[in-house]
Regions:
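N-terminal secretory signal peptides and thylakoid transit peptides that target proteins
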Residues: 1-14
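A generic alpha-helix surface/boundary motif
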Residues: 42, 46, 88, 146, ...
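Pocket-lining segment of extracytoplasmic ligand-binding domains
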Residues: 172-268
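Secondary-structure end/capping motifs
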Residues: 229-315
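Conserved C-terminal helix/tail region of periplasmic/extracytoplasmic solute-binding proteins
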Residues: 302-338
Length: 338
């Protein structure tokens, strides 16, 4: 007798090696992603906007961008998009609250954010505990909040003495820093050069030097959606496209430079000179190692983030990534590439 349980089991044993074919029509994937496109986001964007259509039977994607990544996760819980680029903490929080979600790959590895400080006031982590020093973040419980707390915890800083305020998006944070209303804010590494020209602002924290593992953004899907064998093969195709983009970004500066100018939403990106993009490329590929091959999706590594998430109020005590990480599709995509 074929029950729902046995049907699902059969679906997960369906061979994934072949790419999706939809006959006479091409499938239009509904993708949700971060509104910001910095250098670290370029391969993921190229993957679903160009490479996916080259390797499979896909039309141009139906792309929706959102300023707040937590909103992407909320929509995914409701089952709207096919696949999303979401921040890891909000996916963990939703799963902790009972949502059936799956992390199937990383949008990139590590993180390119730095915490820029007003160096007239802050020159060490301990300075952040001074009563008149204020740290600006986007939203309590978001990935930036967790990122900061993890570094403070690592160095034994009393986080109860650190004044952290929510300021919203990057523009608001930068205005507050320049106006000296706050003394530490997160910025993308490719913004550090411009920020330094505005005054005595210096990177205080470079998270990729602090963490052995950090996951900032992931490819995630709704667990119910993933029960469909066709959707499983879609995930493999997306991840293959991501891996191909990662490989090009890492090994071919000219490719990265061209795609950066095409997809970055920095208003001047199209006119960035090669040497400036080369600095960004070197940082991402050599120091941060944002596009590694193979791209890891290791459960034990993800679970090292849980104590930080607990401190940030993202998940409850005893939470884990055990039910969230689904590595089979990434393994199949990597097998395709050899």
């Amino acid at each position: 007798m074929l029950t729902r349980r046995t049907a699902i089991a059969a679906a997960f044993t369906t061979p994934l090696g072949s790419r999706v074919s939809f006959g006479s029509t091409r499938r239009t994937l509904k993708v949700m992603s971060n509104a910001n496109v910095a250098g670290i986001h370029v391969p993921g964007n190229v993957a679903v906007r160009e490479i996916l259509q080259q390797i499979g039977d896909y039309a141009p994607i139906d792309l929706t961008r959102m300023e707040k990544q937590a909103n992407i996760t909320q929509v995914l819980v409701g089952g709207g998009p096919d696949i999303v680029d979401a921040d890891t903490p909000s996916i963990a929080a939703a799963a902790n609250a009972g949502a059936n979600l799956k992390i199937v790959g990383q949008f990139y590895a590590s993180v390119d954010l730095v915490f820029a400080a007003n160096a007239d006031v802050v020159t060490s982590l301990q300075d952040l505990t001074k009563p008149d020093v204020v740290c600006g973040i986007n939203t309590p419980g978001d990935t930036v909040h967790a990122l900061l707390l993890g570094v403070l915890m690592k160095h034994g800083i009393d986080i109860t003495k650190v004044n952290i305020v929510a300021l919203g998006g990057s523009s608001a944070r930068m205005r507050a820093l320049m106006a000296k209303r706050v003394h530490l804010v997160p910025i993308h590494a490719d913004q550090a050069h411009d920020v330094a020209l505005q005054g005595n602002y210096k990177p205080l924290i470079q998270p990729w030097t602090e963490y052995d593992f950090w996951s900032n953004e992931v490819w995630a899907v709704n667990g119910k959606w993933l029960e469909n064998p066709d959707n499983q093969r879609v995930v493999v195709d997306v991840l293959e496209a991501q891996l191909r983009a990662n490989r090009s970004a890492t090994n071919d500066f000219s490719w990265f430079a061209g795609m950066f100018r095409k997809y970055s939403n920095d208003r001047d990106a199209a006119h960035w000179p090669d040497d400036r993009i080369h600095d960004e490329w070197t940082l991402l590929t050599k120091e941060i190692k944002a596009f590694p091959e193979p791209m890891p999706l290791d459960l034990a590594a993800f679970n090292t983030l849980i104590p930080i998430y607990e401190k940030a109020g993202i998940v409850s005590p005893g939470a884990s990534f055990d039910s969230l990480i689904e590595p089979r599709f990434l393994a199949e995509a990597q097998k395709r590439l050899g």
